[in-house]
Amino acid sequence: MRLYNTLTRKKEVFVPIEQGKVRMYACGPTVYNYFHIGNGRTFIVFDALRKYLVYRGYDVTFVQNFTDIDDKIIKKAQEEAVSAKEISERFIVEYFKDAATLGVDQADIHPKVTENVPEIIAFIQELLEKNVAYEVNGDVYYDVSRFEDYGKLSKQNLEELQSGARIEVNEAKRNSLDFVLWKTAKPGEPSWESPWGSGRPGWHIECSAMAKKYLGETIDIHGGGGDLVFPHHENEIAQSEACTGKTFANYWIHVGYLNIDNKKMSKSLDNFFTPREIAEEYDLESLRFFMLSAHYRTPVNFSRELLESAKSGLERLYNAKNHLEHILENTKVEEMKETEKEWIDSLTHYSEEFNRVMDDDFNTADGIAVIFDLVRDMNTYITGEASKEAVKAAYGMLVELTGVLGLLRKEEESLDKEIGRLIEARQQARIEKNFTKSDEIRDYLKEKGIVLEDTSQGVKWRKE
């Protein structure tokens, strides 16, 4: 597998630090509002990358943080006359709801800044001891002139950055590019005690400290949206490598912008849509399909026309799946023909081709193209005369490859809800001593391959 490394600006063979294991960190949201679908693209990409790595046999530990204390959170809390904690906790819950609608699974660890302040303080102390940071009136700054490799991720040298800097004048700083590690407390704002007085962490230090705590001094993959290359990820490298003396991350992955009218979608430009707004008109699996239909590094212009096209493409895949399910349910052909055995053997070509294109810098667009090639082949070959084994093989390959991308999961979710609804109806019928209806529901589910088990903990179900 090769991945494009932002640090080297080239594709590199992926070799994890520990064979068979991957440690991956992606910068998560600042939780002061609902995230927009530009953020959603990044969440979808890292979710799909994680799924693919697991599919390829890696044991993945994925960490995605929540920035739950920040100027924007404090401002929102003041506007609503509530605590910053109330705002952040509310939007963490909403994040999980919206992420789930996009098919994004929870990370293995979702650390919060406010729960890791002691580790952040200890990290800052190490930087002070190494003389790469300095304290001024309760604020602590990182001295970028003390880190020789500053600018290596964004491919800019210090002189260029300083001459082009549009940074507000701060006489307390030694250099215009120096950035804050610890902010002294302001009246009415959340704060923590530290060796430099009461205050709170700066943005960049949070991820360095949490990545080190949960994944170690060097991690395999780090990334996020393309807008984080500079200054956020550049500053993370400076902090972490100055602190440990080791490479911070071996592979840096950045997701291209989602644009509206060729301008980056952002809250500051007020040109964004949230998943909730898109969900008023579209199934959000179509949005996931849309995001994965382009290479993750390519900037994508969002439009309803393109989303309609994605919706149609996804419907083709669902139609193929439903067609196979229908044949499987109705076919009486048990014995395989010799030609079917050969065709089943040929299906491995699709998984091999899927792996080949996906291994080339996680090319989900080409991966989806392979899936459509499979569907065309299936539609030609699988008819009502096909044997059960041939249909099962085709179905298994389709579900396997789409599952890697987190697609075609709707039936599973709908099935869970439908079974739950029928179990409740059966329970109500039993309470009302309507045993005829109760038995009818049980028999109906049995016909669908669902077996109910009455246990002391309630009714449980399983597929036959």
From Swiss-Prot:
The keyword Nucleotide-binding applies. A motif ('HIGH' region) lies at residues 29-39. One of its GO terms (molecular function) is cysteine-tRNA ligase activity. It catalyses: tRNA(Cys) + L-cysteine + ATP = L-cysteinyl-tRNA(Cys) + AMP + diphosphate. Zn(2+) binds at residues 27, 207, 232, 236. It is an enzyme of class 6 (ligase). Its main location: cytoplasm. Keywords: Aminoacyl-tRNA synthetase, ATP-binding, Cytoplasm, Ligase, Metal-binding, Nucleotide-binding, Protein biosynthesis, Zinc. Its EC number is 6.1.1.16. ATP binds at residue 267. It is found in: Cytoplasm. GO terms for biological process: cysteinyl-tRNA aminoacylation. A motif ('KMSKS' region) lies at residues 264-268. The keyword Zinc applies. Binds 1 zinc ion per subunit. One of its GO terms (cellular component) is cytosol. Monomer. NCBIfam families: cysS. This is Cysteine--tRNA ligase. It comes from Alkaliphilus metalliredigens (strain QYMF).
